[in-house]
């Protein structure tokens, strides 16, 4: 499918394990052709081309690591609300700095994101 036919995915990329996992999952969705990843810091920073893409009306999946919901807040700055929003720390994955998520936590988060993405597109399976 052409990029315009895919949902947009935005992810937190903060310093905690769950933030980095959110970014990793978004990259995997993009590389697998399941969604088009775009730059949330550009949206939050008001970069015109990136704000325009966020406001294009395409389905949006926002992946945040923790309840601070920085990804969701950046979208709100552009007047956009995600169609689906996942906060990884609500999946019983403890937020930690200086350590990566375990393989089990990664698999758990990938399964949750896959289920949510499937609501946006029938091709939403995370590889």
Please describe what each predicted stretch is.
Residues 1-127:
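Iron-sulfur-associated redox domains of electron-transfer enzymes in respiratory
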């Amino acid at each position: 499918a052409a990029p315009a036919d895919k949902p947009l995915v935005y992810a937190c990329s903060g310093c905690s394990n769950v933030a980095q996992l959110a970014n990793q999952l978004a990259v995997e969705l993009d590389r697998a052709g399941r969604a088009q990843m775009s730059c949330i810091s550009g949206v939050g920073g008001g970069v015109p081309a990136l704000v325009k893409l966020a406001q294009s009306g395409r389905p949006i999946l926002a992946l945040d690591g923790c309840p601070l919901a920085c990804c969701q807040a950046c979208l709100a700055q552009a007047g956009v609300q995600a169609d689906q929003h996942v906060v990884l720390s609500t999946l019983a994955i403890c937020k930690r700095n200086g350590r990566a998520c375990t393989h089990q936590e990664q698999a758990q988060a990938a399964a949750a994101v896959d289920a949510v993405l499937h609501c946006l597109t029938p091709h939403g399976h995370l590889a």
